[in-house]
Amino acid sequence: TTPSYVAFTDTERLWPFQVINEAGKPKDAGVIAGLNVLRATAGDTHLGGEDFDNRLVSHFVEEFKRLRTACERAKIHDIVLVGGSTRLLQDYFNGRDLNKITITNDKGRLSKEEIER
């Protein structure tokens, strides 16, 4: 259905007008004043409403589920530092023990080679 509204002007006169959906496109609308008689309509007369809202909600629920899964997979569980930067970064991570695993230079080189492969 097309919503009808009543506007108040500065002179307190009532001026009825309608906002119509032109050509069944949700972004196209027009304002008409005066008496108008609708002779025909085309397109989907049930566009919008509860069905449309439910589709939008379903879409965004799925999108948020996807984002949540991606965030959970990206969580950092352990931080391993190689070199002398441990003391500098420990304050940044609220005193968290950053070196739960010890990596020697030899192990570091082996890991680098595997990563580059």
Curated annotation (Swiss-Prot):
The lineage of its organism: Eukaryota, Metazoa, Chordata, Craniata, Vertebrata. Interacts with PRKN. Molecular chaperone implicated in a wide variety of cellular processes, including protection of the proteome from stress, folding and transport of newly synthesized polypeptides, activation of proteolysis of misfolded proteins and the formation and dissociation of protein complexes. Plays a pivotal role in the protein quality control system, ensuring the correct folding of proteins, the re-folding of misfolded proteins and controlling the targeting of proteins for subsequent degradation. This is achieved through cycles of ATP binding, ATP hydrolysis and ADP release, mediated by co-chaperones. It holds the Pfam family HSP70. InterPro entries: ATPase_NBD, Hsp_70_fam. Belongs to the heat shock protein 70 family. ATP binds at E72, R73, A74, K75, G84, S85, T86, R87. SUPFAM superfamilies: Actin-like ATPase domain (SSF53067). Keywords: ATP-binding, Chaperone, Nucleotide-binding, Stress response. The N-terminal nucleotide binding domain (NBD) (also known as the ATPase domain) is responsible for binding and hydrolyzing ATP. The C-terminal substrate-binding domain (SBD) (also known as peptide-binding domain) binds to the client/substrate proteins. The two domains are allosterically coupled so that, when ATP is bound to the NBD, the SBD binds relatively weakly to clients. When ADP is bound in the NBD, a conformational change enhances the affinity of the SBD for client proteins. It comes from Mesocricetus auratus. GO terms for molecular function: ATP binding; ATP-dependent protein folding chaperone. The keyword Membrane does not apply. The gene is HSPA1L. Detected at higher levels in caput epididymal spermatazoa than in cauda epididymal spermatazoa (at protein level). The keyword RNA-binding does not apply. This is Heat shock 70 kDa protein 1-like.
